[in-house]
Amino acid sequence: MPSTSRAGSLKDPDVAELFFRDDPEKLFSDLREIGHGSFGAVYFAHDARTSEVVAIKKMSYSGKQSNEKWQDIIKEVKFLQRIQHPNSIEYKGCYLREHTAWLVMEYCLGSASDLLEVHKKPLQEIEIAAITHGALQGLAYLHSHNLIHRDIKAGNILLTEPGQVKLADFGSASIVSPANSFVGTPYWMAPEVILAMDEGQYDGKVDVWSLGITCVELAERKPPLFNMNAMSALYHIAQNESPTLQSTEWSDYFRNFVDSCLHKIPQDRPTSDELLKHMFVLRERPETVLIDLIQRTKDAVRELDNLQYRKMKKLLFQEAHNGPAVETQEEDEEQEHGVGRTGTVNSIGSNQSIPSMSISASSQSSSVNSLPDASDDKSELDMMEGDHTVMSNSSVIHLKPEEENYPEEPDPRTRPSEPQSPPQVSRHKSHYRNREHFATIRTASLVTRQIQEHEQDSELREQMSGYKRMRRQHQKQLMALENKLKAEMDEHRLRLDKDLETQRNNFAAEIEKLVKKHQAAMEKELKLMANEEKKFQQHIQAQQKKELNSFLESQKREYKLRKEQLKEELNENQSTPKKEKQEWLSKQKENFQHFQAEEEANLLRRQRQYLELECRRFKRRMLLSRHNLEQDLVREELNKRQTQKDLEHAMLLRQHESMQELEFRHLNTIQRMRCELIKLQHQTELTNQLEYNKRRERELRRKHVMEVRQQPKSLKSKELQIKKQFQDTCKIQTRQYKALRNHLLKSTPKNEHKAVLKRLKEEQTRKLAILAEQYDHSINEMLSTQALRLDEAQEAECQVLKMQLQQELELLNAYQSKIKMQAEAQHEREIRELEQRVSLRRALLEQKIEEEMLALQNERTERIRSLLERQAREIEAFDSESMRLGFSNMILSNLSPEAFSHSYPGASGWSHNPTGGPGPHWGHPMAGPPQAWGHPMQGGPQPWGHPSGSVQGVSRGSTMGVRNSPQALRRTASGGRTEQGMSRSTSVTSQISNGSHMSYT
C-alpha cells in the first residue's frame, strides 16, 4: 500500500481485507487493562460469541505521524496473518473503531520478564533452557520464511497455562530479509542493526544476538549495560566487545550457547536452526519444568497481592481506630516491603538513564521499533494478566479472585481472630472459576507501575522515538536519493542504448541500400555486356559478309579476266587444234574455278575462326571487366563497413566516458548526502546526550533539595529519639535514686536522715546536670554530623554522576569518531571499487573493439579471398573451355583495345573500366594489327600457269591454319600459364584494398 494513503483509509481492497468490519465493542466484553506501552494499551477481554478469553492490543493511529502509525499497523497485521506456529502468538483478527485498531490475539499468562519481576531472582538453568528452546523453535520458523522478529527480549517471550512458549510483539518485525532498518529495543539490539544505515543490511541472525542477550537477562535479571543510558548503550554495543555471563555457577553448555549467540561478526554467529542442535537446549530436562515454574509464579503473585490487600485492610483499620496520625514502624515496614517488591527499581533507578525503563528488563521497552513500533513494554501479550484489576482512571484496585466475590473477607491464615469465612470448598470453586478466565503471572503493582511510568516518562520516550524517527527518515532520504539516481542512470543508459541502436540501424540501412545499389549496378552491367557482345558479334558478321561479297566480286572479275586472257592466248596459238583448245580451256576454267572455290572456302574458314576467336576474346574481356566491377563494389562495401565500425566504436567510447562521469557524479552525491545525514545524526545524538545530562543533573539537584527539605524532619526524629533515651536515663536514675534513698534511710539513724537526703539531692542534681550536658552535646553533635554527612553524600553523588555522564559523553564521541572513520573508509572503498569497475569496463570495451576490428578484418580478408578464388575459378573454367575449343590463352589475351577498335568501332570506348578504375586490364597487347580480310595473301596467287604460286599460297594458308590450330595454341600457352597463375596469387588483398584490379592474363 502506498505510504501516501490517508490513515485509516480502506479504499485499497488489499488493505480492507486485513480488517473485520464488525464493531469490536459489541464483540468483546469485560475489558481490563493489563499492559501499557508507547503503542497504547493491552487488555484482557471475553469474546461474547465464544466466551473465549482473548488479549486485545489497542493501537491509535491519530495525531502526529498518523500515516506512519497506520503503516506500522498494516505491517503488523500482515505479518501476523502470514505466520502460524505453535511457538508464535495466535492471531484472531483486527478491528477498527474511532481511529484505533483492536488487534485480537490469544491470551497468555505473562512474559518471561514477569517471572524475574515476581521472584526477584534469576531463573534456573533448566528453566532458561526450556524458554530458550521454545523461542528458538519460533525463530527458526520465522527465519525459514525470510522473516525477522527484530525485538526479541524476555518481555516478548510469553507463556501459556500449559507451559507453551510463544513469541509475541511483531510490531518491529520485517517481512523481508535481509533488512536495513534501525529497529528494536536498545539493550537487546545487535551491532549490525545499530550500524544498519552505515554498514549495510542484516538478516535473521540479529534475532540470535537478541536471544543471547535475553539469556543473560534471564540469568542476571537484567540485560548487559542496563544501568547505562539507552543511547549510550547503543554506542557501547556498536563498538565494544560482546557481553558474557558474569557468574561462574553456570554450566559450560550455557556459557558456550550465550557466547555463540553473541558473536560480534554476524557471519560467525550460528543460525537459529543450528542453535536448535546445541546441547544446551537438547539436554534432558523435566517436561513439567515450565508448568512448575508457572505454578510457583502464580502462587507468588497471589501471595504478593494478598500482602497488598492485608496492608490496605490494616491501613483502613488503623485509620478507623487511631486516626491518620499513625507513622513509625509500620510505615517503615511497608517501605521495606516496597523495596523488596521493586528491588530492580531502587537498585537501578538512580543510574538508569531512562526512568521508564528502570523497572525491570521486562518493562524496559523503549523499543526502538521503527517508530510506534516502539512498543515500550510491548509485553503486549503479557497482556494476559492475572487477578482482576479494576481500573478507575488512574487508580488501580487489584483484587484476588476470592476477594472479588467476598470483598470483605479477610485471609483466615493471617487474621484468625476475624469472623469465620464461608466454607473453604466454595471459595476454592470460585477461585478456580475465576482463574480459568483470568489467570496471570503478573502482579497488580507491575501493571500499575507500568501505567504510571508511561505517563511520567513521555519526555524520554519522545526523545528515543524522535531519534528512531530521524534514523528512519535519513534512511528513507538516502533510499529515495539512490532510487532517483538509479532511475536517472537507467534513463541515461537507455538513451545511450537507443542512440547506439539507432546508429546501428542507420548503418544497417545504409549497407542494405549500398548492397541493393551494387546489385542493380551489376545487373545493369550484365545486361550491357550481353548487348555489347551481341552488337560485337553482329558487327563482325556484317564486316565478314561485306568482305565475302567483295571477295566473290573480285573472283568473278578475276575469272572473267582470266577467261579472256586464256581465250586470247588460244586465239594467238593457231597451231593448236580447236578441240584440244576447248579441252585445255575447259580444264583451265575448271582448275581456276576449283582454285577460287578453295579460296572461298579458306576465306569462310578464316572468317569463322576469326569470329570465334574475337567472340571468345570479347567474352574474356567482359568477364574480366565484370570481375573488376565486383572488386570495386566489394571494396566500396568493405570500406563502408570499416567506416561504420569506426564510428560505432567512437560512439561506444564516448558513451563509456559519459557513463563514467555520471557514475562518479552520482557516487559523489550519495556520499555527500550520507556525510550530511551522519553529521545531522551525530548532532542530534550529542544534543540528546546533553539534554539527558542536564535532566540527570536536574533530577539529582531536585533529589538533594528534597533531602535538604526532609532533613529537619529527620533531625527532629533523631532528636526525639535522643530525647527519649535521655528521658529513659532520667527515669532509671530517678528509680535508682529512690532505691538508694530508701536503702540509706533504713540503714542510717533518723537524726541523719536530713543530711543524707540533702546529700542525695545534691548528687542527683549534679548527675542530672551532667546528663543534660551530655544531651545537649549529643544533640549538637548529631546535628553537625548529619549535616556534614548529607553534604558529603550529596557531593559524592554529584561527583559520581559527573564521572558517569562524562564517560557516556566520551563514549558517544568515540562512537561518532568511529562512525566517521568507517564512513570515510567506506567512501574510499566505494570510489576505489567504482574506479576498478570503470577501468575493467573500459578494458572490456577496448577488448571488444579490438575483437570486432579483428573480426571485421578477418571478414574483409575472407570476402576478398573468396571473391578472388571464385573469380580465379571462373577464369580458369573459361580458359579451360577456351583450350577445349582450341584457343590459346596467349592469343585470347594479346588483343589490344587499339587493334580491336580498327575492326569494331566504339569498342575502344567500351574497353575502359565502367566504374572509372584503371584502364589496362587485359594483359599484353598483340604485336600488330591483323591483316585485312580483303588481302589474305600478300602478292596474291601466281598465275594459273605457274603452279608454284598456288603452292606458295596454300603453304601460307596452311601456316595460318597451323598457327590457329589447337596444337599451336597449347604449345604457345604451355610456357605462360604457371607464370600467370603465380601473378594472380600474389598480393591479392593489397591489390583490392588499394583499389587496383586483378588481371587474369
Swiss-Prot record:
Residues 324-435, 567-586, 911-1001 are annotated as: Disordered. Keywords: ATP-binding, Cell cycle, Cell division, Coiled coil, Cytoplasm, DNA damage, DNA repair, Kinase, Nucleotide-binding, Serine/threonine-protein kinase, Transferase. Residues 949-967, 975-1001 have a biased composition (Polar residues). GO terms for molecular function: ATP binding; protein serine kinase activity; protein serine/threonine kinase activity. One of its GO terms (cellular component) is cytoplasm. CDD domains: STKc_TAO1. The active site is at residue 151. It catalyses: L-seryl-[protein] + ATP = O-phospho-L-seryl-[protein] + ADP + H(+); L-threonyl-[protein] + ATP = O-phospho-L-threonyl-[protein] + ADP + H(+). It comes from the Eukaryota. Residues 458-651, 754-877 form a coiled coil. Its main location: cytoplasm. Its EC number is 2.7.11.1. One of its GO terms (biological process) is regulation of cytoskeleton organization. Residues 375-388, 577-586 have a biased composition (Basic and acidic residues). It is found in: Cytoplasm. ATP binds at residues 34-42, 57. The keyword Cell division applies. Residues 28-281 form the Protein kinase domain. Residues 350-370, 921-930 have a biased composition (Low complexity). The keyword Kinase applies. Serine/threonine-protein kinase involved in various processes such as p38/mapk14 stress-activated MAPK cascade, DNA damage response and regulation of cytoskeleton stability. Acts as an activator of the p38/MAPK14 stress-activated MAPK cascade by mediating phosphorylation and subsequent activation of upstream MAP kinase kinases. In response to DNA damage, involved in the G2/M transition DNA damage checkpoint by activating the p38/MAPK14 stress-activated MAPK cascade. PANTHER family: SERINE/THREONINE-PROTEIN KINASE TAO1-LIKE PROTEIN, SERINE_THREONINE-PROTEIN KINASE TAO1. Belongs to the protein kinase superfamily. STE Ser/Thr protein kinase family. STE20 subfamily. This is Serine/threonine-protein kinase TAO1-B. It comes from Xenopus laevis. The lineage of its organism: Eukaryota, Metazoa, Chordata, Craniata, Vertebrata.
